[in-house]
Amino acid sequence: MTDADQAREQIREYAVEAALDKLDLDTKARLLSGQDMWSLPAIPEIGLKSLVMSDGPIGVRGVRWTADDPSIALPSPTGLAAAWDPELARRAGRLLAQEARRKGVHVLLAPTVNLHRSPLGGRHFECYSEDPYLTGAVGSGYVNGVQDGGVGTTVKHFVGNDAETERFTVDSVIAPRPLREVYLAPFEAIVANAHPWGIMTAYNRVNGTTMTEHQYLVNEVLRAEWGFDGYNVSDWMAARSTTGDILGGLDVAMPGPQTVYGPALAEAVRAGEVPESAVDTAVRNVLRLAARVGALEGAPAVVEEAPAPIDGQALARELAARGFVLVRNEAVADGSAALPLDAAAGGTVALLGAAARDARVLGGGSAVVFPERIVSPLDGLTSALRDRSGASLTYTIGADPSEELTPADKGFELRAVCRDASGAVVGEGTLPSGQVQWIGDDLPAGASYETMASIEVTGTFLPRENGEHAFGTRGLGAFTLAVGGETVWEGVQEMGNEADPFEAFFGAPSERARVTLTEGEPVEVSLTFQVPDVTALPLKAIMFSLLHLGPQREADELIAEAVEAARAADTAIVVVATTERVESEGFDRKDLALPGRQDDLVRAVAAVNPHTVVVVNAGSPVELPWRDEVAAVLLTWFPGQEGGAALADVLLGDTEPGGRLPTTWPARFADAPVTEVVPTEGRLEYGEGLFIGYRAYEARSIRPAFPFGHGLGYTDWAYESLEATAETVRVRLTNTGARPGREVVQVYLAPVDDGVERPASWLAAFAGVEAGPGESVETEIALPARAFEIWDEEARGWQRIGGTYEVRASHSHGDTRLTATLDLA
């Protein structure tokens, strides 16, 4: 920090203290409670603007859960981490800061830095990695980037929120060493290296104490030990105890206006249950945030002028390609690798799979944003091959992974019409799909919870196929469904036994009717929902969906058509995918199988075309039982809005696939280190201790399908020399291929007979290098002191473990290229 920066920081602190001195108890308590779903109250008398928050982490949705104000949609966080490039993450963060400033958002509710403890985790796609060091490095880059743009970040979910099942109440039981060395480590690294302006405490308990009330982890570890000076906000509806939360270090209870703070907090102070100094501490943290983002009069913002504009579409395309991981690339008939395709030589490409046409570009839940455009694989390849002489593209659906109803989307033009009890329209707006998700004040203009008696999702549907179309609903309450002007179902959906209040919405859809329709002939559709009285609820919300599923042709017939298309083509590209019923916030996965008959499709196509390339459009690992039967496998994660364009760039060789696996890819579900995420009597034991991810595979001598850190490019690298000290590792390598490329040099430490219980090896550091054909490059990589330390619970501190270490310069955890011996005193 420069002298000028320090001076500005002092001015901000003076402004914070001056503002705090002017507030009475009731106003202070009100400031700590959300005024609505996404903001804190303004206090004009001290020059405080309303602080506005918004979900991330791959875009900035803003304060409305609608497509009215589109947002850029970047690749999923796992895809971003796959680039193994903190500086690239920083650039992504700067773009999101630009989006936030455009939308009037002060604080982004991201990044998510929980770990890939189990591939079953419903929000696996929203987290970076199974490795704490990689997570901390990428997360630090992201936080630095967002805050470079003058927008605050909220690192979440602190801590132990690594699965969705019973997430509101589960007790994550984690021993001291894994808690410190694994699960807290990314948060600690980000606090140290990026100085985040906010953190979000999770719903769950850790070792018996609710995280929003966890005095030890928040007050003692996060603040006193690590030096965190930002604001601490609850996950939405996680704050449940006025005294417990304020004494546990929770600054802000969200969402409002009905929270455990506000009047309840002021009363607790007056009753002597809470010292006013605890309230002052929380208010000080909120005012400091306001000062940093420019929302407090008299305090200079950290960033006063908006940075230079960034081309969002171009960066989204670059990010996608940099995160694509080529895990297999075998030689085909002419002896060359399957990828990149030789489009200049012409030939026919058969593109197969439902996800090639209707791409899944992001995961479900609070990470959802509404991009202005989406480039599917079909769009991207069609555009890229249009000007390539002799090249042609065919498309066949092959097999559809969506065997369940989903929110009405393709072919639907819908709007929501809100009416009062007399039937008069009080508000209306367009819908991007059949999903209505209005939370807090996120309502169409003119509508209110007090006046709305019904909401009608209405519009037209232009079928893309002949046959029997299924329609359904999701949500709780009374519905009337009409198709073609006729009521086809009317009834009430009651609440089940779901512990998670969002689970009914995110849970299983209900089919209500089947209607035979004709391709290309529009039909009117309508779903009317009777609005219940929600005015007394702590969180006012309306959530329901009009669902649709197109005609389901026999899978064997679809696969047969795909086989014929593949047989006639020079190259077959099969896009396989998960669905929103497989990967989303609100629930965990049951297994790692691809939905539907997609495995059968791949095998059938590979049997007739030896040049079969499989593109895996999934946010987290899936089983690939056919992986040795195809020429190439490319993992694209949830690639964001420009995914199809980036895919064409990579397949045709215009761009090298830059990704390396941020998580181990199991050969089968049974091999995963953690295969159970359902709590027992409310407790989820982290019995694996330190051994998650690649650490567990190595400890159990299990070979995964693809190891942590694995990824192929379009060139080759020779590792030539390695020098290691306790502070740095120096590696020299040469690009021995015929084209420029990027390599990620991964440094692992392996202790030699030290007698300490810990993994056999772990990632200590990494660096990316670039070189042209025949060019050599040398990189010096700093080794963090923490790489040699373990947590000593008795001493309540970190202990440096001396002895002999093998230092490994590796292409992946399973591919060590050079080793050196290091004796550590």
What is each of the regions a protein language model found here?
Residues M1-E793, G797-H813, T821-L824:
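Glycoside hydrolase catalytic-domain context in secreted enzymes
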